[in-house]
A protein has these predicted regions:
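Short beta-strand segments of immunoglobulin-like
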Residues: 214-220
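Beta-strand-rich structural segments
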Residues: 221-236
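Detector for glycine-centered tight turns/loop "hinges" at secondary-structure junctions
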Residues: 147-149, 234-238
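Short, surface-exposed ligand-recognition loops at beta-strand->loop->(often short) alpha-helix junctions
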Residues: 7-11
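Acidic, S/T/G-rich, low-cysteine, solvent-exposed domains in lumenal/extracellular/periplasmic regions
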Residues: 12-206
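Conserved beta-strand elements of the Class I
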Residues: 4-6, 167
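Proline-enriched interdomain boundary motifs that mark the N-terminal boundary
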Residues: 207-214
Length: 238
């Protein structure tokens, strides 16, 4: 699996995301600029756009035209005016104020089983404050909380229609989540597995069958038939 992380600047999140993703030995991760991404996108199974701005315009055009899956990570350096003009799935009206937002888990989330569950124990992320809207079918995994006040808007949202899947993580500072997860559990395994499940959700072939039935096509009347079935979640995990 080939994942390309696209960023116009440096941030400790980039290395933390790469380390989390390559904990799966079947995953290869490349970190590139928006301009470099134009030569990498064709062979990418997943594109991760980190704090996109207008330099991402040609790449975003390809994603939109080809209805590609995408993971969007936004924060204080994200140009939401640009994003709001280019697409309408995720929109945000910022007010020019940056603050810390803490994650609050939403129990109804059922797209896949998150290996990490201790969301309340993680440090806050940083982002520009503003109302987020998701247009179309989606599920939110995390809601935002500011100074103990839970807001009716997501930190992490999963959008899916018949042609594509997008994920939004609104907030930077994943590197602090990964460090705290290790401090709490003595291992990166659970938090890395969650990042891996998110990437898998975005990179699976939607033509795959989620219900696999194993049976013999023809049975003799006197012989009992045995049918075995396996059901996979949307990340194609048992």
């Amino acid at each position: 699996e080939n994942i390309v992380i696209v960023s116009s600047g440096k941030h400790p999140d980039l290395g933390a995301l790469k380390r989390a993703l390559v904990s799966n030995e079947q995953v290869q991760v490349t970190i590139v600029s928006p301009e470099e991404a134009m030569t990498h996108q064709a062979t990418a199974d997943l594109l991760v756009l980190y704090q996109p701005n207008r330099r991402f315009a040609p790449l975003l055009d390809i994603i939109l035209d080809q209805k590609r899956n995408m993971w969007l990570i936004s924060g204080p350096e994200t140009d939401w005016s640009f994003l709001n003009q280019k697409q309408s799935i995720f929109s945000k009206e910022t007010i020019g104020v940056t603050d810390e937002i803490a994650p609050e888990a939403i129990e109804e989330f059922d797209l896949f089983t998150s290996q990490w569950t201790r969301w309340a124990d993680l440090p806050p992320l940083r982002t520009d404050i503003g109302a987020i809207a998701v247009s179309g079918p989606h599920q939110d995994l995390l809601k935002a909380s500011i100074q103990g006040n839970i807001l009716d808007q997501p930190i992490m949202s999963f959008y899916e229609d018949t042609e594509r899947r997008w994920v939004l993580l609104d907030g930077v500072g994943f590197w602090t989540w990964r460090l705290e997860a290790h401090r709490l559990e003595g291992s990166y395994e659970s938090i890395d597995a969650f990042i891996g499940s998110t990437a898998k959700y975005l990179s699976v072939d939607r033509a795959n069958e989620r219900l696999i039935v194993d049976h013999q096509p023809i049975y003799q009347r006197a012989i009992g038939a045995q049918i075995m079935a396996q059901y996979f979640d949307v990340s194609y995990q048992l």
